[in-house]
Amino acid sequence: MTAIIDIHGREILDSRGNPTVEVDVVLETGVIGRAAVPSGASTGVHEACELRDGDKQRYLGKGVQKACDSVNGEIYDALSGMDVEDQILLDKTMIDLDGTANKSRLGANAILGVSLAAAKAAAEESGLPLYRYVGGAFASTLPVPMMNIINGGAHADNPIDIQEFMIMPVGASSCSEAIRMGAEVFHALKKTLKDAGHNTNVGDEGGFAPNLKSAEMALDFIMKSIETAGYKPGEDIMLALDCASSEFFKEGKYVMAGAKKTYDQKGLVKFYAKLVGSYPIISIEDGCAEDDLVGWELLTDALGAKVQLVGDDLFVTNPARLSMGIDQGLANSILVKVNQIGTLSETLEAVDMAHKAGYTAVMSHRSGETEDSTIADLAVATNCGQIKTGSLSRSDRIAKYNQLIRIEELLGSAARYAGQTIMRR
């Protein structure tokens, strides 16, 4: 047993200049584990509660001093002296202490910071990298990156309704090669957009945010850029979308204001089917709104056999929500965001449940990130085979890619790149 002797939460800034929680967990041996908590822009209503101060005189009401007080007060009192290696008990103790269904009393941002920092302290104490400590001896699969190179929706100030247009270098032989391929396409896209007279400003996740009128225009630019970089779309590199459709679901209709189109559920599914038929799209995230279960059923029936349908707002990394979706046959994949559920052990439970049901899992960042690269380790620890961590710019995104490169180097000949194994046949 190695006891926790101190826990300290502090207010730091995320990649959008908003406050977030960072936690240090200190062990009796002097080892320190540190973790910073991410924050989302397009958030699901079923997510665990991120505790903000609401004081308009500080950080426009977005301060997290209350969450830090939770860490430094009640959580410290409850966990002090406990064994840092008993992750499940640590997390359960915090969940019980909070006493709410969505962690709203202490704040999921407070609880998650402690949960992740404790795991990192335990890994350090064990002399193991985090991916090995969490995942065990068989953690060796490097994920295919979903690289968000054009931003729309809530992540950018442009008319594009779909939130993310991503490339997936499935044809690479290694994760480091996939990252290189992605970087080359990113730079090709920048030149292609610039040559066409578009701005090359970047959005929250590092992708470009040009003033394009439709999803098809965005996809055409990406296809051209893949070819310009010397790769074959549909062979070397596939495409993926995050529609974030809860953001444009209004009174039972899907209102794409930028494209000036409104769809019912069947119409939206036909729109996606047309895109899938025209472009090498292998993954669609949040194709329907979080509570539009009828829409999800239609979408899964229409495209589930050939496209990965990822539930983000639908499942919010919550084992109970995922179990409901599995029972009803909704989607076929779960997006995994540690701050949606608020503890490491619940996150791992959701991934395990997905895999046992034949669903894929995609480890994911949030639009508000920090230099913390924990999710890179968790992607390898869970062998989930896919990671979504933004574009090939902004150091808050690059930190995760760089950590994957390091992990692949550490694994050496044992490393296996997921590549085309993640594609639905």
Swiss-Prot record:
One of its GO terms (molecular function) is phosphopyruvate hydratase activity. The active site is at residues 205, 337. GO terms for cellular component: cell surface; extracellular region; phosphopyruvate hydratase complex. The keyword DNA repair does not apply. Gene3D superfamilies: Enolase-like C-terminal domain (3.20.20.120), Enolase-like, N-terminal domain (3.30.390.10). PROSITE patterns: ENOLASE. Its EC number is 4.2.1.11. Transmembrane segments: none annotated. SMART domains: Enolase_C, Enolase_N. One of its GO terms (biological process) is glycolytic process. It is an enzyme of class 4 (lyase). Keywords: Cytoplasm, Glycolysis, Lyase, Magnesium, Metal-binding, Secreted. Pfam families: Enolase_C, Enolase_N. Pathway: Carbohydrate degradation; glycolysis; pyruvate from D-glyceraldehyde 3-phosphate: step 4/5. It catalyses: (2R)-2-phosphoglycerate = phosphoenolpyruvate + H2O. Mg(2+) binds at residues 242, 285, 312. It is found in: Cytoplasm; Secreted; Cell surface. Its main location: cytoplasm. HAMAP family: Enolase (MF_00318). Catalyzes the reversible conversion of 2-phosphoglycerate (2-PG) into phosphoenolpyruvate (PEP). It is essential for the degradation of carbohydrates via glycolysis. This is Enolase. It comes from Paramagnetospirillum magneticum (strain ATCC 700264 / AMB-1) (Magnetospirillum magneticum). The gene is eno.
